[in-house]
Amino acid sequence: DPEMSRGLGDVYKRQLLALPQFAQERKYSTFYEQRATLFEELPVTSKDIIFLGNSITNGCEWAELFQNKNVKNRGISGDICMGVYDRLDPIVKGKPAKIFLLIGINDVSRGTSADKIISEISMIVRKIKQESPKTKLYLQSVLPVNDCYGMFNGHTSRWQVVKQINDLLEPLAVKEGAAYIDLYSHFVEKETGKMNPVYTNDGLHLLGKGYLLWRDIVKPYVDQK
């Protein structure tokens, strides 16, 4: 479908333009295109439960975690709010039962403000509601980060922005009739405001134990009829 491939071309170009121009990042953007084009070919049905987001979503085996083949992974490493917005079509076209969205930390790493991130998430929410009004939407809070590993400094040095996003995300969910799921408070160390090192080995991504905790938090929402 030339229309669809043209659409993806735009997504890909936007990702490419947004990336710092060095070899590793250029290579990374080819992964984005590989995954986005795969998702365009994989059908979504009204029985499906979609986990949508960036590398943190990308990194999990959701169907195995929930022992449910209708739970589908639509995470792409490196994704940002507008990247998710641009690739909604093949998802909402299938009118999935539920969408669990977790997005924003890569926008934080680019210096984007909490207000701007929320405004872009609200565009995602409105598009889902418009194109697939029966889909139940769950907005998951952005996870805390931890700068003690000296990795992903663009993300982890801006750890305070995460709380600002979450403080605005819950009212957005209420306003738009979506459910808000607070992951943040389960993963954060109260005394530092940073990700509990039990759940990460780089300050940004999750270890197996982190995915099990995430599963335990969202399972009631996944199982809800």
Where do the PLM segments sit?
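Single conserved hydrophobic/aromatic residue that forms the stacking wall/gate
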Residues: D1-Y12
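Oxyanion-hole/transition-state-stabilizing segment in secreted/luminal serine hydrolases
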Residues: L52, T57-N70, C81-S119, K127, ...
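Short, structured coil segments at secondary-structure junctions
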Residues: G7, Q67-K69, E176
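Serine-esterase "nucleophile elbow" of acetyl-processing enzymes
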Residues: L16-K95, K194
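Charged helix-capping and loop-helix junction motifs
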Residues: A114-I124, W159-I165
